[in-house]
Amino acid sequence: MTGIERYLLKDQPEPVSHYCHAVRAGDRVWLSGTVGIRPDGSVPSDVVEQFEVAMDNLDRALRATGGRPENIVKVQVFLIDVNDREKINPIRQAYFGEHRPASTLVGIPALVSPELKVEIEAEAILDSGTD
């Protein structure tokens, strides 16, 4: 594969600015920050549900590029309350299983909308499915 492919997915929340959900260049994939907005536009009030929805959105974007969870090499999680990391860690562990990507957690004062509590972005290398 050569060139750059951009993915603007119909089953994802509409971007709030000028970007796409994922970009693939060769075997590298960048997944834009995604939040816990359901396809119907609703937002769960609970951080755990928001993270579950965000992870589902991230996974669908990853799979649209041909990737799988084990291809993810780096994640960044942005939390309004960093103490919520203990609540969302079981979801991460269930998603990644034995695979452990590099990870950064950042506490932030706000996201794009006041009801949002968590956002996740990731990078993947599609031929990196083995540890």
What are the residue ranges of the model-derived segments?
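Short, polar/acidic, helix-capping and beta-turn segments at strand->helix junctions
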Residues: M1-D131
